[in-house]
Amino acid sequence: MAEGPYGRPVTASLTWQPTLSAADVDDIVSLLATAERADGTGPVSEDVRLTLRPDQRVGAARHLLAVSATGVEASGPRRPIVGYAHLGGALDSRQAEIVVDPGHRGLGIGRALATALTEALGDPPARLDVWAHGDLPPAAALAARLGFARTRVLFQLRRPLGAVAPLPEPQLPAGVTVRAFVPGRDDEAWLAVNAAAFADHPEQGRWTLDDLALRRAEPWFDPRGFFVAERDGQLVGFHWTKIHEVDETPPPGTRPGPIGEVYVVGVLPGAGGAGLGRALTLIGLRHLQAEGLAAVLLYVDEDNERAVRMYTGLDFTVHTRDVSYHWRGAAAD
C-alpha cells in the first residue's frame, strides 16, 4: 500500500483499466456528483464524461480507479471508488484529470493517483498535462509538491440573456449566408474547417468523425442550434450551441436551472471575412435567447486575447477558471 502525507497509509488500492464495467461507471458518476457538490465545480471535462460508458474503448485512453481498502472484501458487496483518474490524449502527449472523494481527501489518494499517472508515461516518457477544474488551492499545492508547473488557464465566461442584457444585431460579411448544420452531409466539411480554425489548439483541432459522432449521439445535440456559414458554397465558419438542462456551477445564492453554451465557434482562416466570428456568436446567442434561456456560458483560453476581447466586448465576464499543470519530470522537495 502506498503512503500518503507524513507516512499515513493510503486507504485505497489503485487499478488501471482499459474499459469500465456498468458498476464502475455508476460508481464514478456518483463520485463526480459528490465532488461537484463539495467543490462547486464539475471535477472533469466533457471529454472525460463521454468515455464513461460500459465496455467502451476510446483510443489510447485508460482509467485509474482508487478503490476503498477499508470496506468489505471482493467476495462481498462492491467496495466504493474513492478516487478516479482518466489518462487520455495521444501516446506522446497525454492529458489527464483527477478526482478524489471529498470524504477521503488528505489521505494521499490524490498524490498516489498523480504519481501513478507519471509512472505510466513510458520510456522515454510522454508529455503529461493534468487539468484541475475550479483552480482550487489544494490542487495547486499538490501540483507544486509533485513537480507540475501551471501552464494554461481556461476561463469559463458568462453573460445574461434577455431584456436585462440586449444583444446587438449580427452583421455578416458580404456574400456570407448562414444555415443549420445537416448531420451526415456537413460532417467532413465541418471537420476540415474545425481543424483549420483550431490548428494550434491541443484538443479541439484534433477532432475526428468519431468525436463528432459521440456528441451527435448525446441527448443535448440539436442541429437547429448548430449554425454553419457559407460563401460560394464553401463552409467558412460555424457556431455550435448547446443547452444544459441544469447549470452545474450556478452563481452563489441562485437555484440551478437550464443554461445555454457557446459550445464552439470557428472561422476558416482567411476565408470568412472581418467580423464573421462575432456575427456567428451573436446568431447563436439569439437562438439561445429565443429558446427561453436566461444565461449563457463559454470556455476560452486566457491567452487567446483576441477571443477574450471579443467576448468581453459582448458583456461576458469570468465565472470560473480551470488550470492545466504540466509535469516537469521530478517532484519538488
From Swiss-Prot:
InterPro entries linked: Acyl_CoA_acyltransferase, Bact_Acetyltransf, GNAT_dom, Mycothiol_AcTrfase
One Pfam family from the record: Acetyltransf_7
Domain N-acetyltransferase: 18-170, 176-333
SUPFAM superfamilies: Acyl-CoA N-acyltransferases (Nat)
Gene3D superfamilies assigned: 3.40.630.30
Organism superkingdom: Bacteria
The EC number(s) this enzyme carries: 2.3.1.189
GO process terms (BP): mycothiol biosynthetic process
Positions with a binding annotation for acetyl-CoA 2: 265-267, 272-278, 304-309
Gene Ontology molecular function, alphabetical: mycothiol synthase activity
Assigned keywords, A-Z: Acyltransferase, Repeat, Transferase
Function as written in the Swiss-Prot or TrEMBL entry: Catalyzes the transfer of acetyl from acetyl-CoA to desacetylmycothiol (Cys-GlcN-Ins) to form mycothiol.
Family statement drawn from the similarity comment of this UniProt entry: Belongs to the acetyltransferase family. MshD subfamily.
Subunit structure: Monomer.
Protein name: Mycothiol acetyltransferase
Source organism phylogeny: Bacteria, Bacillati, Actinomycetota, Actinomycetes, Frankiales
